[in-house]
């Protein structure tokens, strides 16, 4: 603690030192270079004139609490007991006895004209950006906070009347902040993702201090949207089933990708991004700089290549998803937040968020699904103890509402994403429901809303949130790598029975210290399972239980771990196996959305799982060398063609020892067309079609 006198900070008042923790304690010691715990008798103020004097205090350490101050002229004064003597009366200071100064307020810029500009040549399923030349503001405004004192909404309506979106807007500084790092300006934005071509109209609602602000409020106009690409998938939507579906193509979606690093956005090329923990430095993503391609986006003279390249690499493997925390202040990484400062929860960093948006938009252009993890267990509430970074202490208050609105306004236009209420959420069910409901109210595109839990708290967390009135659309599952099938099956069935089927993905694999292991060439600890086991038990375990796919977590004790990873090649084999699984379902037109888990239909010497429908059946065998599987087709009719899929090598379907089977009883499926060499295992997927 530093003690000042009349606006000065004398050396004798500096570095008042305590060493006690979690208790109130009187002390009068000054920290020195030789004695960090402090030396008595070195702290004093020399007041050489009578009259009014101002004593000031400056806190040195975050987390230190300071409650009472005692002054004496006795150098031998003993430390008091308890709370000390009664407080002295405050001096009755005449108003003119001390100098007053007006706080510094930087000059305002001129307000904008109210003109609107739009993206050029907008097309169906491509983002249309509306920019309003609005009131001048700065991120950390003194007299006008653009995040709390104003609200922009833009209503977009298609000429047919069938599509209307009320889209939250946001303050965008000078409109080019990713390049300029601007903190002030007159640009305000909203984004539309148009479902259909044709004429669209817009009307601006702009309120300041709870009243419409002219000439900005009420600005309106129209624009034409051209036909999009005929094969465009469009927006990924929850449609009341256990799989998401694209609104444009009608295709159902399975995902596979990266859950790690959770600190993906702790990237040194983003403005205002700092590392708070020595063991969790900012990322360069240097191993992926060479994966950046000519024509890919950058900012500020070539920044961003590492992370853009990483996204290119992951998409190039055939995977289609990755996740990231957008707020981890006070958490494991403590290096990602959208604010201008870690604790400035009502002032958002325009340039940083624009730069995030460049990465997200590029990922979307590659068909990637973006998993927004909005918080983590360390900062979602106050239950573990005092956590100042928990927005509103875990409740749905002004901090949390603004945060969610800013995320929706800036990134909700992206076609494929989900909002995850939090990693390992420990908020109360009421708090979780309130957060999900608020997202549903402000997100015009109704992106899927999911929640993540500790493995041993799933019953406690998920059960109260089930039901047809739930605002959630899915579960982000964390389980031991070997328990993926059972856990997915549990919540697929429980959610359907409760009246609203959930989309259930396996997004984190235990044990927490290992997760999905790196490939052998990356070294690290020797553990008793391999990427082949992850393929057999985690990947196919989820898919064969009616799950929506996987994201892979990297643990915290293995190379390229959950906090410091910046080389996705460390899990190259796992990406290959996952992409093979996606291709099996997609390229062979497997109607997985019409198949139900039916493990009871298959008998095999080793573990086997089944998804069954009238026209297609998938059987997954963990070890096809143990003998043929027997499939009970008593309740089925017709003749089925039997083909095998190599889960390791991928490729086309091939015929084994049995080409067809007739339904009406139990049938043997035969043996696979080849036997694998080495330690890759002998798992195969079998597709039966009629």
Label each PLM-derived region with a short phrase.
Residues 52-54, 306-309, 488-491, 628-629:
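Short alpha-helical segments and helix-capping/turn motifs at coil-helix boundaries
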Residues 241, 249-250, 469, 545-547, ...:
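Short, solvent-exposed coil/turn segments at beta-strand boundaries
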Residues 151, 207-211, 228-474, 478-486:
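Active-site mouth of glycoside hydrolases
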Residues 402, 416, 422-573:
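Extracellular glycoside hydrolase catalytic/binding regions
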Residues 10, 61-63, 76, 251, ...:
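Short, solvent-exposed loop/turn segments at secondary-structure junctions
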Residues 59, 312, 407-410, 462-467, ...:
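Short, flexible, glycine/charge-rich loop motifs used to bind or transfer phosphoryl groups or to couple energy/partner
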Residues 1-287, 294, 301-304, 308, ...:
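Extracytoplasmic
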Residues 103-106, 139, 500-504, 511-515, ...:
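Aromatic- and carboxylate-lined catalytic core of secreted/periplasmic carbohydrate-active enzymes
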């Amino acid at each position: 603690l530093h003690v000042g006198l009349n606006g000065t900070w004398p050396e004798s008042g500096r570095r008042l030192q305590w060493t006690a923790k979690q208790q109130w304690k009187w002390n009068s010691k000054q920290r020195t270079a030789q004695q960090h715990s402090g030396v008595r008798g070195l702290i004093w103020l020399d007041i050489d004139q009578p009259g009014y004097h101002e004593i000031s205090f400056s806190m040195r350490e975050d987390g230190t609490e300071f409650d009472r101050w005692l002054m004496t002229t006795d150098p031998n004064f003993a430390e008091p007991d308890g709370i000390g003597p009664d407080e002295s009366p405050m001096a009755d200071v005449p108003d003119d006895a001390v100098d007053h100064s007006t706080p510094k307020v930087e000059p305002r810029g001129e307000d904008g004209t109210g003109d609107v500009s739009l993206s050029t040549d907008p097309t169906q399923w491509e983002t249309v950006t509306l920019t309003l030349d609005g009131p001048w503001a700065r991120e950390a405004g003194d007299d006008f906070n653009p995040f709390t004192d104003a609200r922009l909404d833009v209503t977009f309506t298609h000429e047919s009347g069938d599509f209307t979106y009320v889209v939250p807007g946001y303050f965008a500084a000078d409109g080019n902040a990713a390049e300029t790092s601007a903190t002030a300006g007159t640009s305000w934005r909203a984004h539309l993702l148009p479902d259909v071509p044709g004429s669209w109209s817009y009307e601006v609602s702009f309120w300041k201090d709870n009243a419409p602000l002219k000439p900005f409020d009420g600005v309106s106009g129209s624009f034409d949207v051209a036909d999009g690409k005929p094969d465009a998938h469009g927006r990924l939507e929850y449609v009341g089933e256990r799989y998401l579906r694209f609104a444009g193509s009608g295709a159902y979606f399975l995902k596979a990708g990266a859950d790690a690093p959770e600190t993906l956005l702790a990237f040194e090329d983003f403005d205002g991004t700092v590392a708070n923990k020595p063991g969790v430095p900012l990322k360069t993503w240097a191993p992926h700089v060479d994966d950046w391609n000519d024509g890919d986006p950058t900012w500020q003279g070539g920044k961003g290549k590492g992370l853009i390249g990483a996204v290119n690499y992951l998409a190039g493997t055939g995977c289609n998803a990755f996740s990231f925390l957008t707020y981890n202040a006070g958490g494991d990484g403590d290096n990602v937040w959208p604010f201008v400062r870690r604790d400035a929860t009502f002032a958002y960093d325009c340039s940083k968020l624009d730069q995030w948006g460049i990465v997200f938009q590029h990922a979307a252009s590659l068909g990637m699904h973006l998993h927004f993890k909005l918080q983590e267990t360390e900062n979602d509430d106050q239950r573990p103890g005092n956590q100042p970074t928990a927005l509103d202490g875990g409740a749905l208050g002004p901090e949390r509402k603004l945060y969610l609105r800013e995320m929706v306004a800036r990134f909700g236009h992206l076609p494929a994403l989900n909002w995850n209420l939090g990693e390992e959420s420990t908020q109360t069910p009421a708090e979780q429901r309130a957060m999900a409901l608020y997202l549903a109210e402000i997100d015009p595109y109704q992106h899927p809303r999911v929640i993540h839990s500790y493995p041993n708290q799933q019953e406690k967390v998920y059960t109260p949130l089930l039901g047809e009135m739930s605002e959630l659309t899915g579960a982000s599952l964390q389980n031991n790598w070997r328990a993926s099938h059972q856990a997915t099956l549990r919540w697929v069935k429980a959610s359907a029975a409760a009246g609203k089927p959930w989309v259930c993905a396996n997004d984190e694999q235990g044990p927490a210290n290992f997760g999905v292991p790196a490939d052998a060439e990356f070294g690290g600890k020797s553990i008793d399972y391999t990427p082949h086991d992850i393929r057999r038990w985690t990947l196919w375990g989820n898919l064969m239980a009616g799950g929506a796919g996987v994201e892979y977590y990297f643990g915290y004790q293995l190379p390229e771990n959950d906090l410091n990873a910046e080389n996705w090649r460390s899990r190259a084999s796992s990406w290959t196996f996952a992409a093979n699984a996606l291709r099996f379902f997609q390229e062979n037109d497997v109607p997985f959305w019409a198949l139900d888990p039916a493990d009871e239909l298959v008998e095999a010497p080793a573990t086997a799982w089944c998804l069954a429908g009238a026209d297609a059946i998938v059987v997954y065998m963990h070890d096809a060398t143990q003998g043929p599987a027997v499939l009970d087709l008593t309740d089925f009719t017709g003749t089925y063609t039997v083909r095998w899929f190599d889960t390791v090598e991928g490729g086309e379907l091939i015929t084994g020892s049995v080409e067809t089977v007739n339904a009406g009883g139990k049938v043997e499926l035969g043996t696979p067309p080849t036997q694998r060499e080495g330690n890759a295992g002998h798992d195969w997927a079998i597709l039966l079609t009629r």
